[in-house]
C-alpha cells in the first residue's frame, strides 16, 4: 500500500498485492523505487503521464530485476495508482471524470505506446479520440444514467472444489451479477471442466 504525500493537504493512495506469499517483496520494491518520486514537482509528472511511466520503469539498475514484469511491475502499479489517485484529488474529480474530461492530446500523452505501435500509434489513437469527441457528452450521460457492467471473480478462483464453484455462481446470479470472470492457468482439462460448471450454473445469457 503506497501513500503519496505532498506539501499540500492532498495525498494519493495506490495498492498492489500478491495472492499471499511475497507481499514483503512488493514493499521492498516500492522502497527501492520511491527515490524517483521524492521532491518531484507533481505538475511536471501530470504534464506527461506516459513519459512518467517510462521513466520509472527504465531505471538502469532496477531493470536488471524487471523490467516491467514480476515484483517490479507490481510495485510500479502501486506507485502509478497512487499518482492517478492524487491527480484526481488535486483536480477535485473522481478518476473516471478526470479521464473523460481530458483532451485527446492529454489522454494520448498519458499512455506509453512503445510496445503497442504495431497495433496502434499515438497518431492513430489521437484520430480515434478526435473523431468521437462529438459524442462524448452523450456517452457520459448514458453511463451516468445506466451505469457500466462490472464482473465478479468470486466463483472463478483456482483451487475451489466443483461444488463451491457451482454454489458461488448461483449465489452471484441471485445477487444480480451478469458478468463472471474465471481464472485460468492450471491444467487445461481443469480449466475446461471449471468453465463448463460455471456456464451451466450461470446460464447461457450471462457473460463468462
Roles of regions detected by a PLM:
Residues 1-207:
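N-terminal capping/lid subdomain adjacent to the active-site entrance of alpha/beta enzymes
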Amino acid at each position: 500500500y503506497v501513500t503519496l504525500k505532498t506539501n499540500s493537504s492532498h495525498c494519493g493512495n495506490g495498492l498492489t498485492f500478491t495472492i499471499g506469499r511475497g507481499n514483503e517483496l512488493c514493499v521492498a520494491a516500492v522502497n527501492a523505487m520511491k527515490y524517483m518520486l521524492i521532491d518531484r514537482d507533481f505538475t511536471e509528472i501530470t504534464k506527461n503521464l506516459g513519459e512518467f511511466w517510462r521513466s520509472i520503469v527504465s531505471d538502469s539498475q532496477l531493470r536488471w530485476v524487471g523490467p516491467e514484469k514480476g515484483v517490479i511491475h507490481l510495485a510500479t502499479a502501486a506507485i502509478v495508482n497512487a499518482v492517478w489517485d492524487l491527480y484526481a484529488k488535486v483536480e477535485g474529480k473522481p478518476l473516471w471524470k478526470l479521464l473523460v474530461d481530458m483532451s485527446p492530446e492529454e489522454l494520448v500523452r498519458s499512455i506509453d505506446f512503445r510496445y503497442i505501435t504495431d497495433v496502434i500509434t499515438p497518431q492513430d489513437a489521437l484520430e480515434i479520440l478526435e473523431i468521437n469527441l462529438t459524442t462524448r457528452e452523450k456517452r457520459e450521460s448514458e453511463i451516468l444514467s445506466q451505469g457500466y457492467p462490472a464482473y465478479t471473480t468470486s466463483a472463478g478462483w483456482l483451487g475451489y472444489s466443483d461444488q463451491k464453484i457451482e454454489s458461488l455462481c448461483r449465489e452471484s446470479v441471485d445477487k444480480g451479477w451478469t458478468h463472471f470472470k474465471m481464472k485460468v492457468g492450471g491444467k487445461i482439462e481443469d480449466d475446461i471442466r471449471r468453465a463448463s460448471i460455471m456456464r451451466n450454473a450461470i446460464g447461457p445469457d450471462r457473460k463468462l
